[in-house]
Amino acid sequence: LSALGVQLTYKVTDNLLFKLGSYDANPATMSLNQGLKLTTSGEVNGTTLVGELEYKRQYKNGLDGDYRFGVVRSSLDKTKLVNNAGYPAGTTSDMVAIEDTDNAFYLNIEQQLTRNSSGGGLRIFASMIHADQSVSAIGEVLAFGGYIDAPLVSRPHDRIGFAVGRNSVSNELSDAQRFYNTNFSDDEVLVRDHEYPIELNYNYVVTPAIQLMPSIQYIIDPNGDNDAENAMIAGLQLSLNF
């Protein structure tokens, strides 16, 4: 059992939904020792609360939209990224505090822009995740992109997609790294900022049971390192559905 939780959904209007969820936040449930146990175990426990507003809208010609805003609150104890002296945790012998509650929020937008004769069309999306930057090394994730279903009349079940993102290192961690380098110039640590991934993929439906998705990614400033060489990655995903 990976997690225990409960979710309630309240229909405010035909287009507006409010969702509230509570989940057991116990990292021990992901261990190999958990196996097929139907209960959670471990000494570290907490609760993750999620509240979400979802607005759905159906426009003319089947151009629907889906818009979500959510807030996440966790009571699981987490070690802060910066120690009491203002340096990155682990770089000096100074104490590191524990944060017993952290918060995050997210925004997700999807909008159908066009419809074609095959029933597909262009759908765009934008998303943002903003984490608690005192405990999460990745402070913010932004993504923008779109995909076209049925891009060709002869390929009504295929999909082509494109996305651009920005993964940002916690501002608190970056500031602490710069502060450390100011005072320990002979033992500098790498200051990380932003990483920019770009991806193009094509989902090719061989049969209803077999799909192939080749993709290519280009990553600017990998791991937020401005001095790192940009990387290109080619991938191939095989999906079987029987």
PLM feature segments, named:
Residues 1-52:
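Aromatic- and glycine-enriched pocket-lining scaffold segments that form the walls
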Residues 18-24, 67-73, 122-130, 144, ...:
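Transmembrane beta-barrel strands of outer-membrane/channel proteins
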Residues 6, 51-53, 107-109, 124, ...:
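Membrane-embedded beta-strands of outer-membrane beta-barrel proteins
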Residues 10-12, 55-57, 111-113, 148-150, ...:
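Residue-level signature of outer-membrane beta-barrel architecture
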Residues 29, 99, 130-141, 223-228:
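Solvent-exposed loop/turn segments connecting transmembrane beta-strands
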Residues 15, 57-66, 114-122, 150-159, ...:
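Short loop/turn motifs that connect adjacent beta-strands in outer-membrane beta-barrel proteins
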Residues 230-242:
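Outer-membrane beta-barrel "beta-signal"
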Residues 43-45, 99-103, 136-138, 191-194, ...:
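Short sequence motifs at beta-strands and strand-loop junctions characteristic
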